[in-house]
Design a protein with these regions (language model features):
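Cys/His-rich metal-chelating microdomains
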Residues: 41-44, 85-89
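Residue-level signal for well-ordered alpha-helical scaffold segments within enzymatic catalytic domains
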Residues: 12, 84-85
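Basic side chains
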Residues: 33, 88-93
Length: 94
């Protein structure tokens, strides 16, 4: 598994995300999590900042649970790890 180092905020949000329920014997505990929106698998090494990963199946980024435009904050408690396409689909909804 490749080693990635993200910002402290990204790492904190990843750690707070629900663990995947894939049941795979080769599922490393820190390599998968569940998308906060659709609850499908996201992959640690597929964060949007990793080159060539933005369009991968498990690509993810940070979503503001309550959008900034609706009074939300950039605090970790208002952020969740989600698929990039789920984040785009959610848009400004809360």
């Amino acid at each position: 598994m490749a080693i990635y180092k993200y910002s402290n905020k990204v790492e904190a949000v990843w750690e707070n995300a629900d663990h995947c329920s894939c049941g795979s014997n080769d599922c490393h505990p820190n390599s998968h999590r569940e998308c906060g929106i659709c609850h499908e698998t996201i992959f640690y090494g597929s964060h949007e900042t990793v080159q060539n990963q933005r369009n991968s199946r498990g690509a993810w980024n940070l979503d503001h649970i309550k959008p900034i435009s609706r009074g939300g904050s950039n605090q970790t408690k208002n952020l969740q790890a989600v698929h990039i396409f789920c984040n785009r689909s959610k848009g400004n909804r809360y």
